[in-house]
């Protein structure tokens, strides 16, 4: 079982390249983050594999999971813990057939229609958003806001993480609205002190659950 409480989605631009993503991951995991996604849409696959293997090494022995965005072949090549797909990527059935049943499969959902189409026998968790508009994913749908997120979370067929300009001040509201965790990019990536930024998010999630 993967701990989705604080789910770090790496951004190579905000982190300053591969080494920056590795350093950010190390800092975040030391602060309690237990799920890290490698997302670099414009990278060649060889670079993704090299970075993925480096991240896998950093995460070894930490109980933190490595998720690969979009690319099932990269997921297998680096022996990642799971794959995350969007609505226009591989179908969940095809993705599951490729990665097998021992890895987790996440899916992005942005509205009620997409939520209604989720097959929870194939999907382990959902990324629901954007909560608010974000510069790190320019093709994201209309913002849900916390109320819109709550409406979707109330019908969740599996665990959900909230994503889209999530910052510490709204973590508690999202958790109380039905989130099983929060996915963040700029709240950790590119911060002057990624370890402190990650710790603040971990503490907000813990506070909301107490």
Region locations from a protein language model:
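Conserved N-terminal beta1-alpha1 strand-loop-helix module at the mouth
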Residues: 1-90, 97-124, 141-147, 151-160, ...
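A short, flexible beta-alpha/helix-coil linker loop
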Residues: 12-13, 132-134
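Short acidic/polar capping segments at secondary-structure boundaries
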Residues: 132-133, 166-168
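Glycine/threonine-rich flexible loop motifs
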Residues: 136-138
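Short helix/strand-capping connector loops at secondary-structure junctions
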Residues: 178-186
């Amino acid at each position: 079982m993967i701990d989705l409480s604080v789910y770090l989605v790496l951004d190579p631009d905000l982190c300053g390249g591969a080494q920056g993503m590795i350093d950010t991951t190390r800092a975040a995991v030391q602060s309690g983050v237990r799920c890290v996604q490698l997302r670099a849409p414009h990278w060649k696959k060889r670079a993704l594999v090299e970075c993925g293997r480096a991240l896998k090494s950093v995460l070894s022995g930490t109980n933190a999971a490595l998720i690969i965005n979009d690319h099932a072949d990269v997921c297998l090549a680096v022996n990642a813990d799971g794959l995350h797909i969007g609505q226009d990527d591989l179908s969940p059935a095809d993705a599951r057939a490729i990665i097998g049943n021992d890895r987790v499969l996440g899916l992005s959902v942005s509205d009620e229609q997409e939520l209604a189409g989720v097959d929870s026998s194939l999907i382990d968790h959902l990324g629901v958003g954007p909560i608010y508009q974000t510069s790190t994913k320019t093709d994201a749908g209309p913002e849900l806001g916390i109320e819109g997120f709550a409406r979707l979370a109330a019908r969740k067929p599996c665990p959900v993480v909230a994503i889209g300009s999530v910052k510490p001040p709204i973590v508690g509201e999202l958790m109380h609205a039905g989130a099983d965790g929060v996915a963040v990019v700029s709240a950790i990536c590119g911060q002057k002190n990624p370890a402190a930024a990650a710790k603040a998010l971990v503490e907000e999630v813990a506070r909301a659950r107490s």
